[in-house]
Each structure stands twice: as C-alpha cells, then as structure tokens.
C-alpha cells in the first residue's frame, strides 16, 4: 500500500508504517505507510498545482463540486460512519451525525456562494 494523494497510491520514500487500531477494541484495522520529508515535499507541490487548478474554476463550478461532495457524503453515510466508528471507537449514531453535519456544512458553503453572485 502506498501514500494516497493526487488520486493515486504512490510508494512512500521510507519503509516505516503505523498501525491503525480501533480504540474501543484494540483491533488492528490496517497498517499504513508513513510519509517522509521527501513525500511531504511532493505532496505540497501537488497541492500547489491543485490550488491553481481549483482557482481557475468559476464560482458556480466550485459550488457544483461542493454540492456533489455533499450528496456523496449523504449517499454513503452508512459506510463512512462505520469506518469512522471503527477508526475512532465512537458509537455509530455519533459518527452518522458527524457525516451528516459535514454534508450540511458543504451545502451551507454552496448557499453562501449563491449570495456572492447575487442569486438567492
């Protein structure tokens, strides 16, 4: 398994790993590679390119992307909440509430974008 960024899994520069455990059960869920300084530099370079690309999108296009993100959160609430539940050791209803809240925050930014353009 590699470090996931820019839409791809990339082999890490180093060989160190971290175990992801469920704090409620102690179960090891997965071992993930740790990024090293070289990985961090590559990730920052990709992030700068992504920012330039995102900045070139129109406000309505950005709003559409955020709305799609919110819809994907809502469509996949069960899977996302279960993953968060196992990763954080929280109860499932709390995790569902957090995913739902995240979708609502994204929708809120879409509504704010409409006001920036004078549309309501």
Predicted feature residues:
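N-terminal Rossmann-like NAD(P)+-binding subdomain of aldehyde/semialdehyde dehydrogenases
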Residues: 1-120
């Amino acid at each position: 398994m590699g470090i996931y960024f820019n839409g791809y899994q990339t082999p890490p520069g180093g060989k160190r790993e971290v175990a992801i455990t469920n704090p409620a059960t102690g179960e090891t869920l997965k071992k993930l590679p740790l990024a090293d300084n070289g990985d961090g530099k590559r990730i920052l370079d990709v992030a700068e390119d992504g920012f330039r690309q995102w900045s070139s999108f129109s406000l309505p296009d950005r709003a559409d992307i955020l709305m799609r993100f919110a819809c994907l959160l809502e469509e996949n609430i069960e899977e996302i909440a279960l993953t968060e539940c196992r990763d954080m050791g929280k109860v499932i209803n709390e995790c569902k509430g957090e995913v739902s809240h995240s979708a609502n925050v994204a929708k809120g930014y879409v509504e704010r974008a409409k006001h920036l353009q004078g549309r309501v």
